[in-house]
Amino acid sequence: MQLSDMQRTIDAWIKVNGGYWSELSMLARLTEEVGELAREYNHRFGDKRKKASEGEASLEDEMADVLWLLLCMANQQDIDLEAAFGRTMAKITTRDAGRFTTPETDAGA
């Protein structure tokens, strides 16, 4: 599914299910979801182990929750995320051309 399709799907769902939250509520919710993703990363890859009482969370689901909120926020502000992502990739591709080495170029050095 393309980002534009995701945005349309979410917009249709939101309109049937109560409308968009306020901008600050959306930002607070995004912060909450990023925190949940960070917590799971810390449990898996960091020094903080889960308590025995804590269940297993899915990185995929936590990332999808963050994406959901970003798409909602983009819709609320009439932002075409596909177009914005295209501009960001063009910027990064130009700015960082030759900046990083790959394992293949490191081995040949």
Annotate each predicted stretch with a short phrase.
Residues 1-63, 67-109:
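Flexible "arm" and connector segments at domain edges
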